[in-house]
Amino acid sequence: MPQPDSVKARLAALDRIDDELCAVLQHAQATIGALAELKRGHAALQPQLEQHVRDYYRTLEHSTVALRNEIRELDAAVGTQLLPVNIGKRAVGQDQEKLSEQLAQMDKYVGSM
């Protein structure tokens, strides 16, 4: 069953956000690695550490904004595309009957011990 274009667009946007979040983790790893080397006395890595930190925050900000926009888009879609959904409740009372049946079986089992 083919998906509507709006769904394809949302999935593509979420895929890009996922890639950006992976990049955030890679920048965090590079930042921590550079910081560890800097603590070991490699002072020449200071500019590299600063660049990793800038990349981390830039990517984090971009992915956060994109995710917030997708959430806003989903909120808008809920009111227009997804709802109203008619839900007819069926089998009313079966859950209570099943619960009573299970409790009776447990009473029999516990009583026979």
Swiss-Prot record:
It holds the Pfam family Med11. Component of the Mediator complex. Belongs to the Mediator complex subunit 11 family. It comes from Eremothecium gossypii (strain ATCC 10895 / CBS 109.51 / FGSC 9923 / NRRL Y-1056) (Yeast). InterPro entries: Mediator_Med11. This is Mediator of RNA polymerase II transcription subunit 11. GO terms for molecular function: transcription coregulator activity. Keywords: Activator, Nucleus, Transcription, Transcription regulation. It is found in: Nucleus.
